[in-house]
Regions:
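Non-catalytic substrate-recognition/targeting regions of SAM-dependent transferases
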Residues: 8-22, 29-101, 108
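Conserved alpha-helix/loop element of class I SAM-dependent methyltransferases that forms part
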Residues: 101-118
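Conserved class I S-adenosyl-L-methionine
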Residues: 118-129
Length: 291
């Protein structure tokens, strides 16, 4: 398990009975988490002082119960110095806030690889969401192409770039279907030194294209192999679904990339440390190929 344990503006205070108690800056939120199957006693007094609670609906989705008036959005920071990112938090109707804090452990890893390369690095970030990984790579000096199917989410990413003081960095922000974009990049002869992929379990492209993780992931990985440069640095695949284990993702990268590029693969869960107990809540997994 690789814990994201360097946050100051985010904290997983406690977790029990299917819920997380979280601090986002000065705001306390309670959100459901299907991984939290244990029913241990609540350790934090802040359970009773949460500013907002997300309630799931039996029909799917859910809604927020606000116990005090909150701003529509606010900012939190991650990292320090040149690698500091400032990200906009806003509770959405799908329980998310615009930031997956567990990914900070990956952001730091990407930055280390880019800085150590000692050469210009081009990164492709697919299913890039609100741009945490994109901005981490850009802050480390990379040229980045960010692709997501949601126009609103890409706009959020651009706002994060402004908040982080990175709006002038070489970032292309694209609203597109990831598989179609990669196919076009192959035809154009464009290549990348690093690829990051953060695919959802299920989704739709801007043209109504259907994405189902288990059915589509291998084809996309093999397509991406063809847009890697001659001397790539890394290829990272993140997964949030329990149906795709870290070992399965690593196997795909090992059999697809190692025969051509050499290098090595690894995989592990990523998670968030719980302040009240010292345990770590698993939040997904990452498989990595690196030179």
């Amino acid at each position: 398990m690789r814990p994201a344990d360097t946050w100051k503006d985010y904290e997983l205070l406690d977790a029990t009975e299917g819920n997380r108690l979280e601090r986002w800056g000065e705001t306390i939120l309670i959100r459901p988490d299907p991984q939290v199957v244990w029913k241990t006693p609540k350790q934090s007094p802040l359970w009773a002082k949460a500013d907002a609670v997300y309630h799931r609906s039996n029909q799917g989705g859910g809604e927020w119960e606000y116990r005090r008036r909150l701003p529509e959005k606010w900012k939190i920071s991650c990292g320090e110095g040149e690698e500091k990112l400032t990200l906009i938090v806003s509770p959405t109707g799908f329980k998310h806030t615009g930031v997956f804090p567990e990914q900070a452990v990956n952001w730091a890893w990407y930055q280390q690889k880019i800085r150590a390369a000692g050469r210009p690095v081009k990164v492709l970030n697919l299913f890039g969401y609100t741009g945490g990984a994109t901005l981490a790579c850009a802050a480390a000096g990379a040229t980045v192409c960010h692709v997501d199917a949601s126009k609103g989410i890409v706009a959020w990413g651009k706002d994060n770039a402004v908040a982080s003081g990175l709006a002038d960095r070489p970032i292309r922000w694209l609203v597109d279907d990831c598989a179609k974009f990669v196919a076009r990049e192959k035809r154009r002869g464009n290549t990348y030194d690093g690829i990051i992929m953060d695919p959802p379990s299920y989704g739709r492209g801007p043209g109504g294209e259907i994405w189902k993780l288990e059915d589509c992931i291998y084809d996309l990985v093999t397509q991406c192999e063809e847009v890697l440069s001659d001397k790539p640095l890394f290829f990272a695949v993140n997964s949030y679904t329990t149906g795709l284990s870290p070992a399965v993702m690593e196997y795909m990268l090992k059999t697809t990339l190692v025969p051509r590029f050499g290098g090595k693969t690894s995989c592990d869960e990523i998670g968030l440390p719980v302040s009240a107990t010292g345990g770590v809540v698993p939040c997904g997994a990452t498989a990595i190929w690196e030179e």
